[in-house]
Swiss-Prot record:
It comes from Streptomyces lividans. It is an enzyme of class 1 (oxidoreductase). Substrate binds at S138. It comes from the Bacteria. This is Probable oxidoreductase. CDD domains: retinol-DH_like_SDR_c_like (cd05327). PANTHER family: NAD(P)-BINDING ROSSMANN-FOLD SUPERFAMILY PROTEIN, RETINOL DEHYDROGENASE.
Length: 297
């Protein structure tokens, strides 16, 4: 891949999957902006890219749970944007946590913040002429159709994993709804990076980690045989961001570097993308919900 002259934004690019995505894009010659809550945390990666003679890498402040922060980032952007990788996320907050706007924190960070960022950068993406949005979702969406009636768990018991799945279904539906931008030369696709141990698990308690089989009785964490390294997990993100094989492809869901099969609720086979996450009517409804929520906030 030669991405010389291309400009990319990677949210949550200071560590884990995001850092590996940044490394790959910069190595191909792209100018990469790491959008992160703590820009100083990205400094080692910035210096690493400079020492390697890769594309320019720099960091800017962005808090996806704060609409003002997202708006500030988008307003400050100058020039076209070729690649937007919506990589940042949080998972399984143990207690119901709300933003100052009253939004459930996982939905706010994983979906609403990225929706606000993409819409705020729409003109920059359009001006690139052939831009790509890459959304990192999760297999957690499979059993969780988006709950339009109570997305913030105001009237039902809070469940950390249901909230996470809710946000990840929203991520996939966003890419389906983004087909409205195809005439602007913008494509959007989602992906499941697979099982990987990163800082994403920082809110998961030891009991759950043991139940998942990734922590022993002494508290030692180790991946299971089917777990990927962060570099392996980032491969599909990089494919969607840069491969000419994906020119013009939009509204699809990928895993392991290929388009995933569609599964219906109740399918017990691992992997795939749920039909409820590809529903165009739900995608349009979610787009309207996102726009209304942001305008009210």
């Amino acid at each position: 891949m030669d991405l010389t002259g291309r400009r990319a934004v990677v949210t949550g690019g200071a560590s884990g999957l995001g850092a590996e995505t940044v490394r790959a894009l910069a190595a191909a010659g792209a100018e990469v902006t790491i959008a992160t809550r703590h820009p100083q945390s990205a400094e080692p990666l910035v210096q690493e890219a400079a020492a390697a003679g890769a594309g320019r890498v720099h960091a800017e402040a962005l808090d996806l749970s704060d609409v003002a922060s997202v708006d500030s980032f988008a307003r400050a952007w100058r020039g076209p944007l070729d690649i937007l990788v919506a990589n940042a996320g949080i998972m399984a907050l143990p207690t119901r946590t709300l933003t100052p706007y009253g939004w459930e924190m996982q939905l706010a960070t994983n979906y609403l913040g990225h929706f606000a960022l993409a819409t705020g950068l729409h003109a920059a993406l359009r001006d690139a002429g052939s831009a790509r949005i890459v959304v990192v979702s999760s297999g957690a969406h499979l059993g969780t159709p988006f709950d339009f009636e109570d997305p913030h768990f105001a009237r039902r018991p809070y469940d950390p994993w249901a909230a996470y799945g809710n946000s990840k279904t929203a991520d996939v539906l966003f890419t389906v709804g983004a087909r409205r931008w195809a005439a602007d030369g913008i494509t959007a696709n989602a992906l499941n990076p697979g099982y990987i141990l990163t800082r994403l698990q920082r809110h998961v308690d030891d009991e759950t980690m043991r139940a998942f089989g990734v922590m022993d009785d002494q508290g030692n964490v180790k991946p299971l045989p089917y777990y990927k390294t962060p570099e392996q997990g980032a491969a599909t993100s990089v494919l969607l961001a840069a491969s000419p094989l994906l020119n013009g492809v939009t509204g699809r869901y990928f895993e392991d570097n290929q388009e995933a099969r569609t599964v219906e609720d109740g399918d017990v086979q691992p992997g795939g993308v749920a039909a409820h996450a590809l529903d165009p009517e739900a995608a349009d409804r979610l787009w309207e919900y996102g726009a209304d929520t942001l305008s009210a906030g």
